[in-house]
UniProtKB/Swiss-Prot annotation:
Coiled-coil positions: none
NCBIfam families found in the cross-reference section: rpsG_bact
HAMAP family attached to this UniProt entry: Ribosomal_uS7_B (MF_00480_B)
Name of protein: Small ribosomal subunit protein uS7
Length: 156
């Protein structure tokens, strides 16, 4: 792999049903072994369940959930004078979205419901209501950053 240039970021096309790039990124996150059709049916099925359960637009619920999951601060390890410090830093917008989607899908996979469609739908609804393990993950990340606030001056 060439180390000359950084690989350019490819543009993500919006999905055909909701016309949203965020939904496409969710589908890509859910996808395993290149099975996009399976991933698409899981995500769209979960959105149908959300629409039936809440009676509101599933995309709005999903966007609210993402806002509640995406972290604002995180800690990064920084070596200063022979010891490592956990330095709190702000999260870039692109990384916020990436972390939010990663946490959502990872935690949905660990849930106990029968199908991935059910797990994803329940986790998105929980996150939209500011409950659930994905929101707890964000709170833990923020708590860690707050606890290490004394090392903020090591930011680079």
């Amino acid at each position: 792999m060439s180390r000359k240039n950084r690989a350019p970021k490819r543009e993500v096309l919006p999905d055909p049903l909701y016309n949203s790039k965020l939904v496409t990124r969710l589908i890509n996150r859910v996808m395993l072994d290149g099975k996009r059709g399976t991933a698409t049916s899981i995500v769209y099925g979960a959105f149908e369940q959300i629409k039936e359960a809440t009676g509101t637009d599933a995309l709005e619920v999903f966007e609210t959930a993402m806002e509640n999951i995406m972290p604002v601060l995180e800690v990064r390890a920084r070596r200063v004078g022979g010891s490592n410090y956990q330095v709190p830093v702000e999260v870039r917008p692109e990384r916020r979205t990436t972390l939010g989607l990663r946490w959502l899908v990872t935690i949905a996979r660990l849930r106990g419901e029968h199908t991935m469609q059910d797990r994803l739908a329940k986790e998105i609804m929980d996150a939209a209501n500011n409950t659930g393990a994905a929101v707890k993950k964000r709170e833990d990340t923020h708590r860690m950053a707050e606890a290490n606030r004394a090392f903020a001056h090591f930011r680079w």
